[in-house]
């Protein structure tokens, strides 16, 4: 192992010496091209997809509404491949709180929408921005409202016939809401 480290160190020194020699001792001032030939400027439409924010009080939520029954269909089509048929199985993050935590197949308590997230509006915001994984930001507001309703219902937070919209979503009280506190430190090292 020591020989490998020594060889690596000698190689780095040699590369640095060559680079410095070629540039007259100015290795860190190489002139790079203005563009590396990849990427492009984002369009206004692409920027608008990401330029959103939904606050805990619902400010920023779009018009529309969602139903649990419709969300179940959207979930099956666009989410179950990553999160499992019921939101528990995976292979990616678990979304639904386990209804039988004594099941020996269940891992330790995972952070889910039903036991960790502080605000229901965050569910909408996160789905809208980041899902589905293979095409983030592609869901319509209607699909996101439907998915939000379905996931809140599956976590036991709303009834099957509840309608989720900009007025009702902020009123859903999440079980973990009181576990999150605002950071009120002021430019100092103090810790509460």
Residue ranges with predicted function:
Residues 72, 87-128, 132, 166:
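Gly/Gly-Pro-rich "capping" loops immediately C-terminal to redox-active cysteine motifs
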Residues 136-192:
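Flexible coil segments in periplasmic/lumen-exposed cytochrome c-class electron-transfer proteins
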Residues 1-9:
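Sec-dependent N-terminal signal peptides
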Residues 8-27:
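Bacterial Sec-dependent signal peptides at the C-terminal "C-region" and cleavage site
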């Amino acid at each position: 192992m020591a020989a490998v480290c020594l060889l690596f160190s000698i190689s780095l020194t040699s590369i640095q010496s060559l680079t410095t020699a070629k540039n007259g001792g100015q290795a860190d001032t190489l002139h790079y091209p203005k563009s590396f030939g990849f990427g492009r400027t984002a369009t206004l439409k692409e920027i608008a997809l990401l330029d959103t924010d939904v606050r805990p009080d619902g400010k920023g939520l779009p018009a529309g509404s969602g139903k649990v029954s419709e969300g179940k269909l959207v979930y099956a089509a666009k989410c179950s491949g990553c999160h499992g048929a019921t939101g528990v199985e995976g292979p990616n993050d678990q979304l639904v709180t386990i209804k039988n935590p004594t099941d020996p197949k269940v891992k330790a308590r995972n952070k889910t929408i039903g036991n960790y997230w502080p605000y229901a509006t965050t569910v909408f915001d996160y789905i809208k921005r980041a899902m589905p994984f293979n095409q983030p930001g592609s869901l319509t507001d209607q699909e996101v409202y439907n998915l939000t309703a379905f996931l809140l219902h599956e976590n036991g937070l709303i009834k099957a016939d509840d309608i989720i919209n900009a007025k009702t979503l902020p009123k859903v009280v999440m079980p973990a809401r009181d576990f999150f506190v605002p950071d009120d430190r002021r430019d100092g090292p103090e810790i509460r």
